């Protein structure tokens, strides 16, 4: 019965294209915490006017009452006109009500659309320990390993070994597409298998996922496929977009469901190709495999109770750290500043590896606590043991982003004779080979 009600509710939302239960932040919460929501939006750099939103929502509620009152009057007149010949006065009243109701309904729809448009741009509230400022204001939390220096650029090295071909990739698909060949392709597979083995041992259930999602799923997860500067490839003429990360289909896995408290947390890991336009990345570190339009990735994802999410955030981070410690990479963990957070995240950690080529830190993986933001966007809830129902919390984290992982290994395990040392933990997945 509950699933049926969810489907009915979803159909109504699809018809109207306005679904207040699917707003990323609850309007009631925004009303009761207007200053906090406005400050958080400002800290994240989102141009949202909460006062305007609440004023429009007041208008919406007033119009809703007017529409309901007019509908009651219409129904009353219809009842009086049944069973006998109606007098002209009732007919005239009915005609006038029809005009007034259509007018009010039109105003209501227009106001609802304005409210919904603003609500979609209200970002999640940040945690109190998130640093203020932009990218340069993110704070180092911890560091691991010793820095190396003096390595050859990963692209020059890989090309010299005959392992990567961007020229032929560009010939068949355009810039930033590539072929991996021989031992480097095998090394990518080795990293994947190693990471998958480790992550599943930590309690994450492995899933393969759709490589496309509908726009509701993408938007509910906090992505904007049709927004300005979007990173997603939208399928023309279809309600579909290619995924930029397995986070998108994993978020949608439990859409419009009510989960049982006893089953949480649910931990998943999804492997998929990722497709990104990489709009707005010019001037950043983009050479070679570091930033491309297509790459493979193993993603971790969690659905949990609100009181579990901070602990699970640390768990996901610890899994990411353990993977790179075992491979043997120097890195640090950064608490990302508010101005560099996306809309869904209340807090995000980045792991940045030490590049011996550039002699600086470069982004490697990230993990985010999105609290109930995505869950509200896709109507994912939990029934408590006392019968109450509320939104779950969701979290995501990169186990390994394969193209970037290869950059890290190519930079850190080169030898003077031109060979590459295979990290010890990867050797069982490379037929026992120590060097390639």
Each PLM stretch: what is its role?
Residues 21-145:
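N-terminal alpha-helical targeting/anchoring segments
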Residues 143-436:
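TRNA-recognition modules of translation machinery and tRNA-sensing kinases, especially anticodon-binding
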